[in-house]
Amino acid sequence: MINVAQLTRLPRKFGKYYDRQFLPLLEKTGLSMREIHVLLFLANHPGQDTARDVTELRGIAKSQVSQAVETLTGRGLLSRRADGEDRRIIHLEITEQGAPLAREAQAVQAACGGRLLAGLTEEEQTVFLELLERVLRRTEELSMEKECQP
């Protein structure tokens, strides 16, 4: 039988560990974790480069994404570009100035994943990540339901 308490504890524990790994970068840059999340999302998801993409796929509130984008563009780390076909759509691009910071954040992110899975063999890591992806997909499906059903 599955221990649901463990499942609900994992995201909180990992989230705290993950965010803590970024503290030196946050102190160095003066950015918030949310701003780093937006920068990382754009770096890790080429082609998914609108504020709406960040909101929907990363699960950050629209107002928070908007505020983060304002800060990042104000610091010259992101730029905005209107879509060629629909000028209402604004694409976000990491600037030349923002690229080194995005790479540094990606390195921290990769190190977090590496440390987390370090106790597993390569085969176990593959199986774990495949199972995790299936659970995430199922979670997405269930999140659309109105209430929990047995």
PLM segments and residue spans:
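C-terminal regulatory/oligomerization modules of transcriptional regulators
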Residues: 1, 123-150
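Short, locally clustered residues in the helix-turn-helix/winged-helix DNA-binding domain
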Residues: 15, 40-46, 106, 133
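Charged, amphipathic alpha-helical coiled-coil/dimerization segments
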Residues: 19, 70-133
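Surface-exposed, interaction-prone regions with an acidic/low-complexity signature
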Residues: 1-9, 62-65, 147-149
